[in-house]
Design a protein with these regions (language model features):
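Hydrophobic/small residue at the entry helix of a nucleotide-binding pocket
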Residues: 20
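Conserved hydrophobic helix-helix packing surfaces used for dimerization/oligomerization
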Residues: 11-13
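Rossmann-fold NAD(P) dinucleotide-binding segment
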Residues: 66-72, 76, 80-112
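N-terminal Rossmann NAD(P)H-binding glycine-rich loop of SDR-like oxidoreductase domains
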Residues: 17
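NAD(P)-binding Rossmann-fold cofactor-contacting core
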Residues: 27-51
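Rossmann-fold NAD(P)-binding glycine/threonine-rich loop
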Residues: 107-124
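A short, basic/flexible loop-to-alpha-helix module at the beginning of a structural domain
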Residues: 1-8
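Short acidic-hydrophobic, aromatic-tinged amphipathic segments that line or gate anion-handling sites
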Residues: 56-61
Length: 124
């Protein structure tokens, strides 16, 4: 099996201000993941508290990656918005760093949305 990121990889959380994003990001910090912040459109400039630490929130992935030099993103957004979040992350990593790892565990993403998102990522 290939190793896609190192143990100290800088990770962003898309949807960090939502219920699932907060829950999972908190557990990730507790278990030692190097969270560097999050992205939620319209909530840039805010911070979230995870494990008694403050993490910044940006409006866009491009802003977040530029500010943090993140290596990966994990996506915790509702199914109707997940494919768009994947494509935004792909664009941002491509334009800022040239590469990055995108993880999305959202259940119930419409099949056609995922087909479009996967094609978008692979055809870059």
């Amino acid at each position: 099996m290939a190793i896609w990121i190192e143990e100290d990889a800088k990770v962003l959380v898309q949807g960090i201000t939502g219920k699932q994003g907060m829950f999972h990001a908190d557990k990730m910090v507790e278990y030692g993941t190097n969270i560097v912040g999050g992205c939620t459109p319209g909530k840039g400039g805010q911070t979230v508290e995870l494990q008694s630490r403050e993490f910044p929130v940006w409006n866009s992935m491009t802003e977040a990656i530029t500010a943090t030099d993140a290596d990966a993103t994990v996506i915790y957004v509702p199914p109707p918005f997940a494919a768009e979040a994947i494509m935004e992350a792909a664009d941002a990593f491509d334009s800022v760093k040239g590469e990055g790892v995108i993880v999305c565990i959202t259940e119930g993403i419409p099949t056609l949305d995922m087909v479009k998102a996967v094609a978008y990522v692979y055809n870059r």
